[in-house]
Structure formats: structure tokens, C-alpha cells
Amino acid sequence: MLIPIPALNDNYIWVYKRENLSVIVIDIPEIAALSQFIQAQNLVIGALLITHNHRDHIGALAEFKQFYPHVHIYGPAECADQGVTQVIDAGRLIIDEYHIDVLPTGGHTAQHLSFLIDGHLFCGDTLFSAGCGRVFTGDYSQMFTSLQLLKSLPDETIVCPAHEYTLGNLAFALTTGKNKSAVQKQLEKVKKLRAENKPSLPTTLALEKQINPFLQVESLDEFIELRKAKDVF
């Protein structure tokens, strides 16, 4: 089971479940939509994973702890004072029978983490469909390195970003002149999905390599120029 639960204006709370196992939840911008889904599906939460410390990813952490006081909450050191029960760094995390690769994807924030579970990449605000996150408390070199790391994953990796930014990102991607036919084709597909109030996500790494200009840059300088152009688009 892989479910993107809409939250706030354009966030997704990702819920992942393997058969006969508990649920893994990624980020918690608000509690109502998640708790309603968990109750309706009669599910048990095994863990909450936090990608970074921005409010639209941890805003309901205190409420989550009230609803689910026995659930462990894992997150980066930048979330240590926000209510996580276990601070983690890059490496391997084992929860129930889930073997989770914790990836260092700083750039958007300095200690941003991404999580790879059974070929599903939960990448927070590092990689979006056709785009990437802004650089805030991290730096451009970090973000470029993080994107190169994610780009090196298998093409069949299912990519689960935290925001529904795809339409705007595709509009910008068209202006770069890279793979315009593939970008235009995906833009038309996403327009139809969004008109039906359906998510454009998840995506795949194979598709992102075709339509995402930030995965096509070959140098840090090129990345910085592109990221600054997107910042004012």
C-alpha cells in the first residue's frame, strides 16, 4: 500500500505498508487527514519518519504524539528539539521487518534526510517531480550532491516527494529547452490528473531523468544557475 494523503495546501503525508506489517508514515504537517485514514482502514502505525524541520512537515508532531503516544518518531538532528523520539543520521534503520536506507540529502535544509523503503524513495523537499527544493539552511553544493545521489538510484525507483508542485515545475522545465517533447507530454498528463483532483505523484526516477532539468545538469555551476532561475520563475 502506497497512499499520498493530501494535507495543508499542497503537501502529502505518505503512508506505506507492506502486507501483514504496520504502517510507516512520512512527515506530519497535520493530523486530521492521517488519523481519519488510519481509523477508517483499521491500520496500526509502526513509525513516523521525519525528513526535515520545516513547519509544513512537522507542524502536527505534538498532536501526533497525543494520538499515537507509543509510536517511535525518527528524524534528523535538526528536529531533536521538535519532539522526535530518536535522532538518526544516514545509514540503515530497521523497523519491524522494514529495512530502511536513510540517505543524507541536505541542501533544502542542512540535515535533510530521505528514506528508501522497498524501492520507494520518500525524498521530502529534496527532489520533486520535474524540480527540486529551494536551498534554505543548506547550501547549493549540498543540494547538487544530494540530487546526484538520488539520480544514482535504480531507474525503477518510485519517487514520493512531499509536495504537489508538478504543474509549476513542468512549466519551468519547458523554458529550459531540455527534452521539450517529454516535458510537454507529461504536462498534458498532469493537467488532466489535477483537473480531476488526482495527485500527479508518485513518479519514477526513469521519468524524472527525462523531464527534470535538475537531474540533467552536469556541474555545480550549472545547477546554481538553474536553481536561481527557478527561484524567480
From Swiss-Prot:
Its EC number is 3.1.2.6. Keywords: Hydrolase, Metal-binding, Zinc. It catalyses: an S-(2-hydroxyacyl)glutathione + H2O = a 2-hydroxy carboxylate + glutathione + H(+). Pfam families: HAGH_C (PF16123), Lactamase_B (PF00753). One of its GO terms (molecular function) is hydroxyacylglutathione hydrolase activity. Zn(2+) 1 binds at residues 52, 54, 108, 125. GO terms for biological process: methylglyoxal catabolic process to D-lactate via S-lactoyl-glutathione. InterPro entries: Clx_II_MBL, Glyoxalase_II_hydrolase, HAGH_C, Hydroxyacylglutathione_Hdrlase, Metallo-B-lactamas, RibonucZ/Hydroxyglut_hydro. It comes from the Bacteria. Zn(2+) 2 binds at residues 56-57, 125, 163. Pathway: Secondary metabolite metabolism; methylglyoxal degradation; (R)-lactate from methylglyoxal: step 2/2. Binds 2 Zn(2+) ions per subunit. Its cofactor is Zn(2+). The keyword Chaperone does not apply. Signal peptide: none annotated. The keyword S-adenosyl-L-methionine does not apply. Thiolesterase that catalyzes the hydrolysis of S-D-lactoyl-glutathione to form glutathione and D-lactic acid. Belongs to the metallo-beta-lactamase superfamily. Glyoxalase II family. Monomer. This is Hydroxyacylglutathione hydrolase.
